[in-house]
Design a protein with these regions (language model features):
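Glycine-rich nucleotide phosphate-binding loop and flanking beta-alpha elements
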Residues: 120
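Signature of the catalytic double-stranded beta-helix
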Residues: 1-50
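Catalytic core of non-heme Fe(II) oxygenases with the double-stranded beta-helix
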Residues: 31-113, 123, 130, 144-151
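Acidic, two-metal ion nucleic-acid-processing modules in DNA metabolism proteins
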Residues: 133
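An acidic/histidine-cluster motif and surrounding catalytic segment
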Residues: 137
């Protein structure tokens, strides 16, 4: 149902025009699905995923994270506080003037879908709390079947 939801929303928004994916039956969920338990000071460096589409769903987001971004000490020295936020990076990351990013402060029940190849990172927070999210990747069914066949031939 998650692949179907993504495909339906992406189609309505015109986001499937330049992809080979036309309907949800062409997407399959890759295993494993994983749970992220992030505690104070933990973070994920810039990375990307396999497959076509990645998804993250936030199950628990402590209110203290939002407070850090609106009232925290670093708000006095930064126009863009980043405590506990997720940032997607595009362009030539590391090249001045040729890259950008999109930063969100997750809320409970937020679901984000994005291209699996898109670099992203998660910033640390100071709150003595735990944030919980679930992540999954979707692959193109035909490509995944070819990959499995190739693995079997080795």
């Amino acid at each position: 149902w998650l692949a179907s939801l993504y495909t339906e929303c992406a189609s309505k928004a015109g986001r499937t025009k330049n992809t080979n994916i036309r309907k949800s039956e062409e997407l399959i969920m890759q295993k494993p699905v994983w749970v992220n338990y992030m505690k104070s000071g933990e973070w994920n460096p810039s990375h990307n995923h396999t497959g076509k589409i990645s998804c993250v769903t936030y199950l628990r987001v402590p209110k203290e994270i939002d407070d850090e971004n609106t009232k925290g000490e670093h708000t006095k020295v930064s126009n863009t506080p980043t405590a506990g936020r997720i940032e997607w990076q595009f362009g030539n990351v590391g090249m001045p003037y040729s890259s950008g990013g999109y930063i969100r402060t997750p809320k409970e029940k937020d679901i984000y879908f994005f291209p699996a190849a898109l670099s992203h990172q998660v910033y640390p927070f100071k709150a003595k709390a735990e944030r919980v999210s679930v992540s999954v990747n979707f692959a193109d069914k035909i490509e995944a079947e070819l990959d499995l066949r190739q693995l079997g031939e080795r």
